[in-house]
């Protein structure tokens, strides 16, 4: 059996849609009530909380379980949505060992639920789904802090049936997303089937079951990942860079391997050369308190993985959230600095060629954004961490193509001087703290631009048209000939040449009238009076003749090769016939 001392605390990320109960769930686990102090009960800051194994066993209510679990506890990360999951990275991989995806059992899947699942699938992270808010199912009688099986037994058969229906809607949606899933107590193999735990984060029902499943997953599938060397040099990831009164710039980090001591030399990733500095103070949260509550810190001389810790040291201003932090010695300082720099360079994109610009607040979110846009085959010219600067704005303004004269900003600010410049420029800026929204907004913008470009083309291009001279509707024979016509396909416009089916151009449409009013064009199905200059009825044209708009070759190329899919069905049919007529004598016409 693995020695308990060699297993570090598993890092757990809580993900899910806004207002589905992530923070309430964590509060229940911690036994604190941080939610009440947060605006709108939505998590606002990054935090990390260590829940020791003894506290978990106490929640489970069975002291005999103490010897079954080797891990020293669970380290919970809590942030808005899945921001921390992408921030906490390690060489392009996810740092979190486990994840909880919280779903409101009554509302079902929402956009950020899907995004959470995509991220977890991409990083192959084991997770459990928490079907929250069971206390809001009609007729549910809450049993405070009770395990799910016990509270479920106390419900009426109608309520049990309602829960099962809602639960299997969640399970069905997980199947649609490519995950085999089942209620956790019916799962025989957690490696093949995802466990879904029904809970109420508000009443505490089902919370012991969530902890049990997490410990089980850690024990069964992560034992090798959790082994670490307590005596080795500390390795971690920067969670947040924070200005603290009396301390200046500090780093909130998650240490996931080795030990970090006061006085250690550390190397931290930044936009330029890596930062090399000495740890002045280590501030570790007490057990069951959150990193974001500064008054609860205690100074410590060293920390061992896994732990959330605040570092005070000189020169931390340029540190990047999501970047590596590593302990170095005099002997390997240059080597460690080189490794840290190469890791940062792997993420940054600066090709200088065609594409959009992406700015993000952390390396992890930058990676996630780049991944999503590349998945959609959107070219990226530049991607880096940091706020949108005046330089970025000027650079983007030099791009002529409106599809790429774009800056995407995730969780970043726009500098005031950049904002002034952007107001006067044609650069399009999209900012949000939700990745999928940025992708959607850009897709919508691209569609609008393409439609605008097509509209412009449509306005200048001569489109296909087909019409028939109606019998008994010759109003004037020549100079110009005025006849009644029915539009059989496409559109006819004034000032366009017309031809017969044999290819002979017979004249130009000089005017169109409908019910005595002059009109610029007429679409399929319309019957109008048409003035044709250059044609004489009885010579070049006669009643019952079918004529076509003589589309110039250059325009025909654009219609066939660039905007064909945007044409209406009758326009496509008319164009196809027109091209066939034109290519009888010249097969390469408009090719």
From Swiss-Prot:
- Name of the gene encoding the protein in the UniProt record: infB
Q: Please list the residues that bind GTP.
A: 16-23, 78-82, 132-135
Which terms in the Gene Ontology molecular function aspect does this entry carry?
A: GTP binding; GTPase activity; translation initiation factor activity
Q: What is this protein's name?
A: Probable translation initiation factor IF-2
Note whether Cell membrane occurs among the keywords.
no
A Pfam family name for this chain?
IF-2
Region (G2) residue ranges read: 41-45
Keywords, alphabetical: GTP-binding, Initiation factor, Nucleotide-binding, Protein biosynthesis
Entry GO terms, CC: cytoplasm
What is this organism's lineage?
Archaea, Methanobacteriati, Methanobacteriota, Stenosarchaea group, Methanomicrobia
